[in-house]
Amino acid sequence: MKADIHPQYHETTVTCTCGSTFTTRSTKENGAISAEVCSQCHPFYTGKQKILDVGGRVEKFERRFGRRQPGQKVGGAK
């Protein structure tokens, strides 16, 4: 195996938006990573239903394109 071709691992603290933190190792040099979800708040691990709508994606889509009514046709052919 060649020497000095692999990146250096650094101790890194991962901080979730829920406030929990844990330490791991990473090639990222500044030693800090932020995460949106972790095992403490992810619905799969907690067993609780929670909507993870980051940045209001649904609302942004509805503002941009509007909400269609049933039976309403989409724009005509050109």
Curated annotation (Swiss-Prot):
Instruction: List, in alphabetical order, the GO biological process terms annotated in this UniProt record.
Output: translation
* GO cellular component term, pick one: ribosome
Asked if Zinc is a keyword of the record, the answer is: yes
Sequence positions that bind Zn(2+): 16, 18, 38, 41
PROSITE patterns membership: RIBOSOMAL_L31
UniProt keywords, alphabetically: Metal-binding, Ribonucleoprotein, Ribosomal protein, RNA-binding, rRNA-binding, Zinc
**Which cofactors is this protein said to need?**
Zn(2+)
Tell me which HAMAP family the record gives. Answer: Ribosomal_bL31_1
Could you tell me what this protein does?
Answer: Binds the 23S rRNA.
**Protein name (record):** Large ribosomal subunit protein bL31
